[in-house]
């Protein structure tokens, strides 16, 4: 009788554990399918571009590069947020000037809703906005910012008359126009998100300067940011890792959707929540706040586990070693001994950017 009673108590727990395990397995299977599906999509997308533009002319959107194809992949707009340039190109054999003109106008006047534009297709889904994303970041030949279609059209005509260039890919002629963004374009983009950053900073107790430094390093404040790893948005949040961790900590099931992470406020909230998790949970045992900040920055790029393994394969021992080192030694160790060159550079970039934002 006691055995039956004990089984009666344990059975619900076993069922609960089993259902959780089944749900986790189902989630992992879905993640694998999503990842494989994304890889297939990217491969087909690159193939479509290569067929028209040639192998050396394949250009795909990235964290700091907005690239949108239209006209059956024959026309593209590329905003390089690092270099501060807009390049509009066409390889079309018919009416290249008209195609360029249309692409220039729509690029200058597009809105700032990344969820409305599919960067992995040639669908012309760019909507002209009364509040263009690039407003204030680019000026016309008279030095005026561009908000309305009339001014954008006149500027496009001017560019085609005075700045049109051509080159050959070996088989076809590519026509292009390049526009420079204003010198302080980075600050102008950052200013758009200050209110959202301030709100997330207060909510999660993360320094505003760190959030801004992460955003600059990850995307150069490009809300359309994507990556080969399928990291999304301003803070380059990966749905199935950081996004999943944050949702779990907030009592939510699954992962944030692409549309959720392309929303600037949701992206900043999720990225900042993850920074707080790294600081308070995964790396919370590091006592010196500066040392912990260096660890958190590096972990945002390469994971908390890889940070700790730089010091020891045992997590507790790694924390003890870090706590015995000066912040300067922790910084030197992470920027010289972390196995990932990207993570080593990442700490330097974010730390440098954060110093700049602290002075503002």
From Swiss-Prot:
Domain of life the protein comes from: Bacteria
Membrane topology type: Lipid-anchor
Signal peptide location: 1-16
InterPro entries: Lysozyme-like_dom_sf, Murein_transglycosylaseC, Murein_transglycosylaseC_N, Transglyc_AS, Transglycosylase_SLT_dom_1
Bilayer-spanning residue ranges: none
S-diacylglycerol cysteine lipid attachment residues: 17
Any single GO BP term: peptidoglycan metabolic process
Main location: membrane
Keyword flag Metal-binding: no
SUPFAM superfamilies in alphabetical order: Lysozyme-like (SSF53955)
EC number in record: 4.2.2.n1
Catalytic activity: Exolytic cleavage of the (1->4)-beta-glycosidic linkage between N-acetylmuramic acid (MurNAc) and N-acetylglucosamine (GlcNAc) residues in peptidoglycan, from either the reducing or the non-reducing ends of the peptidoglycan chains, with concomitant formation of a 1,6-anhydrobond in the MurNAc residue
Record-linked HAMAP family: MltC (MF_01616)
General function of this protein: Murein-degrading enzyme. May play a role in recycling of muropeptides during cell elongation and/or cell division.
Descriptive protein name: Membrane-bound lytic murein transglycosylase C
Organism: Cronobacter sakazakii (strain ATCC BAA-894) (Enterobacter sakazakii)
